[in-house]
């Protein structure tokens, strides 16, 4: 597997509000040689444009931020190597589809004297999720939704006395549901 990527973005300021549209280009070349099938050679190339837009605004001593971005993950070399794990499963090769997603996030971050904080909510719509497990072939599972909240804070005790440590705390809540899809398996 070989990959190259590049991006362009622009910051547009409207007073305290900043808008940042951007575009990322990903180029992937994947090859597979199956030596157990007479050195069968497969090749697949992809060029993908991934748009995104983010915003931020300084309000009341904090920063509100958010964005919507397109995500893309091609099948890994490891998934391609063991696609046909198990008997009686469909033949597969480089026809495994890439995962695509829309990633949305909104949150606030700031500083209150001895406390840095950040709270964000997120929602991710994933299409063609690549999934596997014991006795299961890597296949495109289907559509999956994930959403949750991330909270992070740093207590800056070193501001009180230089010998005191800063203490960081983080928490993430994640809820995921399979909206549409089936796992193909040999497990009875």
Where are these regions (language model features)?
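Outer-membrane beta-barrel proteins
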Residues: 1, 9, 39-43, 92-96, ...
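Gram-negative outer-membrane beta-barrel transporters
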Residues: 13-19, 28, 114-116, 121-126, ...
């Amino acid at each position: 597997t070989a990959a190259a990527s590049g991006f362009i973005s622009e910051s547009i300021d409207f007073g305290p509000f900043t808008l940042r549209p951007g575009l990322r280009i990903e180029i992937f070349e994947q090859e597979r040689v199956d030596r157990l099938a007479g050195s069968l050679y497969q090749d697949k190339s992809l060029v993908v444009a991934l748009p995104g837009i983010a915003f931020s605004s300084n309000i009341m001593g904090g920063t509100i931020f958010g964005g919507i971005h397109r995500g893309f993950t091609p099948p890994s070399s490891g998934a391609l190597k063991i696609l046909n794990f198990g008997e009686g499963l469909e033949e597969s090769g480089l026809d495994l589809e890439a995962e695509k997603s829309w990633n949305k996030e909104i949150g606030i971050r700031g500083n209150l004297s001895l406390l840095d904080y950040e709270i964000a909510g997120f929602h991710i719509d994933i299409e063609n999720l690549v999934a596997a497990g014991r006795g299961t072939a890597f296949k495109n599972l289907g559509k999956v939704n994930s959403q949750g909240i991330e909270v992070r804070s740093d207590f800056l005790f070193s501001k009180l006395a230089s010998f005191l440590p800063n203490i960081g705390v983080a928490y993430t809540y994640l809820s995921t549901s399979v909206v549409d899809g089936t796992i193909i398996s040999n497990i009875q």
